[in-house]
UniProtKB/Swiss-Prot annotation:
Topology in the lipid bilayer: Multi-pass membrane protein
Protein name, as recorded: UPF0316 protein SAB1848c
Main location: membrane
Organism whose genome encodes this protein: Staphylococcus aureus (strain bovine RF122 / ET3-1)
Keyword Ion transport appears in the UniProt entry: no
Signal peptide: none
Source species, domain of life: Bacteria
Length: 200
């Protein structure tokens, strides 16, 4: 490794790459642990420690120049962003989306069910009168698509999304993994719903 330490630019590049990899694994492991994916987190921690042992010894012993210190700090921050982006792309787990709507005529529950979503809905009452509340469980990778779909169907809907800590029983655990959502674009739904309302 002497050829690395003797070349200052190569040293800077090495510090950056090693620290990005190390902090990426560290960030992913922390997120996965919090989400309850213990075995995946353990596998990621193996890679994290491997990078630490192989690379960080070299890095830490060469932080005697200002460019190396700045590169180390920059690599650390980039590693956090990369780790979070990877976790977002993997989209592990599920999201619960609660929707409150005043538009009963839209028949949102059946519209969403026809697209492949599992929907539980019930009547509720707020300051401005009766409302329909829907609870929808969806894999995280479909969360953005579901949000866009609801906004196109009912732009005034009140939407809250959160990740459940534990799920047990009912349609959710048995059906959601087998259920496949229809291939559609959320923007296409607005004109369809408007046409249905006008035809009533």
């Amino acid at each position: 490794m002497s050829f690395v330490t003797e070349n200052p630019w190569l040293m800077v590049l090495t510090i950056f790459i090693i620290n990005v990899c190390y902090v990426t694994f560290l960030t992913m492991r922390t997120i996965l642990t919090l989400k309850g994916y213990r075995y995946i987190a353990a596998s990621v921690s193996f890679l994290e420690v491997l990078v630490y042992i192989v690379g960080l010894g070299l890095v830490m012993s060469n932080l005697d120049h200002i460019q190396n210190i700045i590169t180390y700090a920059f690599g650390f921050s980039i590693g956090i962003i990369v780790g979070m982006k990877i976790e977002e792309k993997l989209a592990l787990g599920y999201t619960v989306v609660n929707v409150t709507s005043a538009e009963y005529e839209l028949d949102l529950p059946n519209e969403l069910r026809n697209l492949g979503y599992g929907v539980t809905h019930y009547a509720a009452f707020g300051k401005d009168g009766s409302r329909m509340v829907m609870q929808i469980l969806t894999p995280r990778k479909y969360e953005r698509k579901l949000m866009d779909t609801i906004k196109n169907l009912d732009p005034k809907a009140f939407i809250i999304a959160y990740e459940p800590r534990n799920i047990h029983g009912g349609f959710w655990t048995k059906g959601i993994r087998r259920r496949k959502l229809k291939d559609y674009e959320p923007e296409e739904l607005e004109s369809v719903v408007e046409h249905e309302i006008q035809s009533k």
